Amino acid sequence: MSYYSTSVAKLIEELSKLPGIGPKTAQRLAFFIINMPLDEVRSLSQAIIEAKEKLRYCKICFNITDKEVCDICSDENRDHSTICVVSHPMDVVAMEKVKEYKGVYHVLHGVISPIEGVGPEDIRIKELLERVRDGSVKEVILATNPDIEGEATAMYIAKLLKPFGVKVTRIAHGIPVGGDLEYTDVVTLSKALEGRREV
């Protein structure tokens, strides 16, 4: 016997598919949404649909954008000879909050993780190599998370970049091992970027 009507159960089920949302939080969110005015619910659902329909990946760096080329890649004031490699689009947001990095980015959309069945061909490493191959890149900063998968991915990319003769650096470890860039405070992230080391 279900405690909820079919509609409520379906809403809870869908909300619990979101990352970090367990059954209890999904239930709380569902009842919050149910109690919202209908126009606010429509506005929320429209914002979700619009984001899904309009957003895409930048054709250069693979960050999320609503244009063919994102604002960072199209900004002529940025240093296009320095590429900061991150795992996810949220890492770009974290790095931009520091307000010290003036280069461009490359978003891998994951890390190498044999346990999860993710190999180098499943993330955007090939596209990074193509960007470096054109010869205008002087430095690649590897800013993947300092966990096992992030370290393995950084070392793998560093090895692939050696033949290109570019400077390859790794952000310093003011960031705790196993930590996520997304949740790192601005000062720590700033110091980690400042203290990056050559790989």
Swiss-Prot record:
Cystine crosslinks: none
Record's keyword annotation contains NADP: no
Gene Ontology BP annotations: DNA recombination; DNA repair
Keyword Zinc-finger attached: yes
Pfam families: RecR_C (PF21175), RecR_HhH (PF21176), RecR_ZnF (PF02132), Toprim_4 (PF13662)
PROSITE patterns noted in UniProt: RECR (PS01300), TOPRIM (PS50880)
Keyword list, A-Z: DNA damage, DNA recombination, DNA repair, Metal-binding, Zinc, Zinc-finger
Domain of life: Bacteria
Protein family according to the UniProt entry: Belongs to the RecR family.
Protein name as it appears in the record: Recombination protein RecR
Species: Caldanaerobacter subterraneus subsp. tengcongensis (strain DSM 15242 / JCM 11007 / NBRC 100824 / MB4) (Thermoanaerobacter tengcongensis)
